[in-house]
């Protein structure tokens, strides 16, 4: 009696590649190609924190979960996008990739843009009236593209959310910003230490508005 057997081969590559598969005469051929040979544009999206690193934590709410929820809403938009864009995500579950692997994904894929999504907290971690949206960029980027992208993200978010403008902020002390070789923006959507914003950030409609604003910013920037 014959049985259908399934085999799995896992390959670990040094670079980010797309796989093109062809078959002929019962042989399967795999070609590993640069993402830019397949897609018109390449985007890397990062959900902050994850796993045993929750980020800001307030009233039983973890930043890592809010960051991921927004990213998953953003993924829905990119999945429906009719443009030829390759989008890579540093995480789509409750994992915690290293800082090096996060920025490495952007650099190794030579992404057209790298977007990292976070939420903010006061320095003390105490609840306060401080609120608003800010976006970090790489001041060391001599092309000015990082700041340009950050400004676009901020503008779209302010219009969509009606949040307070906390401006664009130099973020070179942040590893994934400092080490990025591609245009990068790290978005702090809102303050979890503000009662109203914490409530908003947990709201599905608010998360969808956030995702749509960032989607629009990415599309406008890369095209």
Regions of interest found by a model, annotated:
Residues 29-163, 174, 199, 208, ...:
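Catalytic-core regions of hydrolytic enzymes
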Residues 5-7, 63, 183, 210:
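Generic detector of short, well-ordered, non-transmembrane alpha-helical segments enriched
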Residues 14-16, 72, 140, 158, ...:
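Residue-level marker of positions within ordered structural domains that often coincide
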Residues 20-22, 166-169:
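Short beta-strand
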Residues 3, 127, 179-181:
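A generic structural micro-feature
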Residues 123, 136, 167-223:
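Active-site-adjacent mobile loop/cap segments within catalytic or ligand-binding domains
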Residues 1-43:
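Signal-peptide-cleaved, periplasmic/extracellular N-terminal interaction regions immediately downstream
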């Amino acid at each position: 009696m014959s049985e259908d057997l399934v085999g799995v081969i896992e390959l670990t590559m040094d670079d980010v590649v797309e796989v093109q598969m062809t078959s002929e005469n019962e042989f399967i051929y795999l070609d590993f190609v640069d993402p830019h040979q397949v897609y018109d544009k390449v985007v890397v999206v990062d959900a902050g924190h994850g796993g045993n690193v929750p980020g800001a934590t307030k009233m039983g709410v973890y930043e890592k979960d809010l960051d991921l929820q927004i990213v998953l809403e953003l993924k829905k938009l990119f999945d429906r996008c009719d443009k030829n864009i390759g989008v890579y995500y540093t995480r789509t579950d409750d994992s915690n990739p290293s800082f090096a692997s996060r920025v490495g994904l952007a650099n190794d894929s030579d992404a057209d843009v790298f977007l990292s999504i976070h939420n903010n907290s006061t320095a003390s971690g105490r609840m306060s009236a401080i609120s608003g949206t800010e976006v970090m960029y790489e001041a060391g980027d001599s092309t000015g593209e990082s700041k340009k992208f950050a400004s676009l993200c901020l503008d779209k978010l302010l219009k969509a959310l009606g949040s307070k403008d906390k401006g664009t902020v130099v973020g070179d002390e942040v590893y994934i910003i400092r080490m990025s070789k591609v245009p990068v923006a790290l978005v702090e959507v809102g303050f979890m230490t503000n009662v109203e914003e914490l409530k908003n950030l947990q709201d599905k409609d608010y998360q969808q508005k956030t995702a749509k604003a960032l989607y629009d910013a990415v599309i406008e920037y890369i095209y």
